[in-house]
UniProtKB/Swiss-Prot annotation:
It is a peripheral membrane protein. Residues 2-238 form the ABC transporter domain. This is Hemin import ATP-binding protein HmuV. Part of the ABC transporter complex HmuTUV involved in hemin import. Responsible for energy coupling to the transport system. It is found in: Cell inner membrane. The gene is hmuV. SUPFAM superfamilies: P-loop containing nucleoside triphosphate hydrolases. The complex is composed of two ATP-binding proteins (HmuV), two transmembrane proteins (HmuU) and a solute-binding protein (HmuT). GO terms for molecular function: ATP binding; ATP hydrolysis activity. Belongs to the ABC transporter superfamily. Heme (hemin) importer (TC 3.A.1.14.5) family. Pfam families: ABC_tran.
Amino acid sequence: MISAQNLVYSLQGRRLTDNVSLTFPGGEIVAILGPNGAGKSTLLRQLTGYLQPDSGECRLFNKPLNEWSITELAKHRAVMRQNSHMAFPFSVQEVIQMGRHPHRTGNQDNETAQIMALCDCQALANRNYRQLSGGEQQRVQLARLLVQLWEPTPSPKWLFLDEPTSALDIHHQQHLFRLLRQLVHERQFNVCCVLHDLNLAARYADRVVLMQKGKVIANGKPQDVLTQQALTMLYGADITVLKDPANHSPLIVLDH
């Protein structure tokens, strides 16, 4: 479980998170949605311990984040940021193996190979990371996070992803979310991601959180949260919300 209680964070007189309280029990994919500047990435950084709130508290497995050591926290949660630049010309395999650093032990070769296959990175293994496309880099970073959290015996872990599909083609978007579902169901992973694609959230998320001006304005199942009234008010766009015939999830369409 991860929880946030009364999070407040201001920068240059602007509240980026405004009295945010949330509890995610785990065993689900959570999507945080909202327009640009809503506070989504700021909230994610607070939930992961990278940014201390001005007031309020975050807990992971009922323990305050500021009471975790950096090493132990890294074994229980992993974070993909929007941009992951490398200053040196590491190979893809070297970047992925960096995920084992908190464990102070090398990962088994067969497990690394398994994770690279899960993330469709095998063909990239010997490539220079800095020469990859944005989508290829996102796949490599996901593999690094899985190597960081992977244990022989599955145990509860948290995976935080900030716009993980921003550079992915449609095939790899589908592949990513199918993999995340597999990790939730088979490896006791819990996933929290910031997204801009409303239809991906509607199709794959178990829970949706809507943010506006630093506040959480809705939190619940996609079919309850992603309504035409709520989305029109939030984004100011002309849209129609239909029902996906395949799974009855919301289907958001831009009007002409």
